[in-house]
Amino acid sequence: MGFRLPGIRKASKAADAPKGYLAVYVGEKLKRFVIPVSYLNQPSFQDLLSQAEEEFGYDHPMGGLTIPCSEDVFQCITSCLN
């Protein structure tokens, strides 16, 4: 059993995200998600960005944007943005 979040693309092994998308790393295992850049304007996603800034500043361990929440919380928030 599974579900699909249309706004989130399956992370590929390529380091680059497609045009209009951005890679973020989420959860303890730093799972990679590729999300639309339009999420950056959403208040609920901006809250996640504020948490990331408080925890990591501008030094993100994966080299990309790291979101300090569980994968479940991230998927719940992003599913509401679709």
From Swiss-Prot:
Similarity comment: family membership: Belongs to the ARG7 family.
Annotated GO biological process: auxin-activated signaling pathway
Matching InterPro entries: SAUR_fam (IPR003676)
Phylogenetic classification of the source organism: Eukaryota, Viridiplantae, Streptophyta, Embryophyta, Tracheophyta
Keywords tagged on the record: Auxin signaling pathway
The protein's name: Auxin-induced protein 15A
Induction (record text): By auxin.
Pfam families linked to this entry: Auxin_inducible (PF02519)
Isomerase recorded as keyword: no
